[in-house]
């Protein structure tokens, strides 16, 4: 299993602007300075002025905290693999995917932890671009048989109220998150011209995991070569207002060997009481880490992680979901994540 960091930033973090020149421009300028005799005695000010003539304003973005998890198993897209699962889909998902050379066409499924925009804002992008991609999967191409998706759903709505499961991405979600997700993304997805009854199932093969109506806790097992990873949703409280509460359902990924990777996702507390055993059992923890000057009270703050967290837990934690990169004592944590970082487990 390979986990790649798409973004590490908090919901409202912003990037930075800088003045710069491109590598080709820098090479041309360097050759000009090296070869022309009049440049040999040029002052720093003259060289700086020449650079400024070429410089442009560039933006270094900060992507929201989402992840790509890859399993060595066949994907929906008719290739040998990997199966690519998104852990949350923030509003800047399309840009974050482009940063690692991927698009929605490369994604097989998504897990949604809770309905804040930095975790679901990219659902509309993922849904619409895969729905209107006739080649998203070989099964979809065969099912469409040359028809446009809107025509297929309109003309054959009795037979096909929604596309078949192998023609759309998987959506793994806890039952208590599904309703809020429907309300949040529904208006933006009800946009297939002429087709009645467009809903979340039109776009996704929904798989509810976690506690079922029967009382059973349903898990999902991913093949990973000759091995397997079991994905289980875990409950953590994120926000409590005067009248409502919002939980975030993180995931525990357990390998056949017992090796465990824990994503609590957004949590109100550094180590919620109900997750103590999960933290202790985990071999690696992807840890929510707020660095805001004024703590929000709905994320663990870096000062608490440094001063109050058990050292045995600290050593397991990879920190993310920050505004500014956290300043922590060297060696205290397993690391501070950056976009593009990748780790292979177990």
Can you annotate each of these PLM segments?
Residues 260, 267-346:
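Cap/insert and terminal regions of metallo-dependent hydrolase folds
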């Amino acid at each position: 299993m390979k986990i790649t960091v798409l973004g590490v930033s908090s919901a409202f973090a912003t990037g930075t602007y800088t003045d710069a020149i491109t590598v080709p421009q820098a090479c041309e300028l360097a050759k000009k300075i090296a070869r022309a005799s009049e440049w040999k005695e040029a002052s720093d000010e003259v060289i700086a002025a020449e650079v400024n003539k070429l410089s442009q304003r560039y933006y270094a973005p900060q992507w929201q905290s989402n992840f790509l998890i890859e399993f060595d198993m066949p994907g929906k897209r008719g290739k040998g693999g990997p199966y690519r699962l998104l852990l949350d889909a923030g509003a800047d998902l399309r840009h974050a995917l482009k940063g690692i050379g991927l698009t929605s066409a490369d994604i097989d499924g998504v897990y949604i932890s809770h309905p804040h925009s930095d975790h679901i804002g990219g659902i509309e992008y993922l849904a619409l671009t895969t729905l209107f991609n006739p080649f998203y999967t070989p099964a979809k191409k065969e099912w469409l048989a040359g028809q446009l998706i809107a025509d297929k759903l309109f003309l054959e709505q009795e037979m096909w109220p929604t596309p078949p499961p192998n023609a759309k991405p998987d959506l793994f979600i806890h039952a208590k998150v599904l309703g809020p997700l429907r309300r949040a993304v529904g208006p933006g997805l009800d946009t297939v011209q002429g087709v009645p009854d467009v809903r979340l199932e039109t776009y996704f093969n929904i798989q509810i995991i976690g506690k079922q109506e029967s009382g059973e806790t349903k898990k999902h097992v991913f093949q990973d070569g000759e091995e397997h990873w079991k994905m289980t949703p875990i409950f953590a409280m994120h926000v409590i207002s005067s009248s409502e509460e919002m939980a975030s359902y993180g995931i525990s990924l357990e390998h056949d060997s017992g090796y465990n990777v824990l994503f609590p996702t957004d949590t109100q507390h550094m180590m919620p009481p109900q997750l103590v055993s999960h933290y202790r059992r985990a071999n690696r923890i992807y840890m929510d880490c707020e660095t805001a000057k004024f703590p929000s009270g709905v994320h663990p703050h870096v000062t608490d992680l440094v001063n109050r967290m058990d050292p045995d837990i600290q050593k397991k934690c990879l920190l993310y979901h920050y505004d500014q990169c956290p300043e922590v004592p060297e060696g205290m944590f397993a690391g501070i994540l950056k976009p593009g970082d990748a780790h292979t487990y177990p």
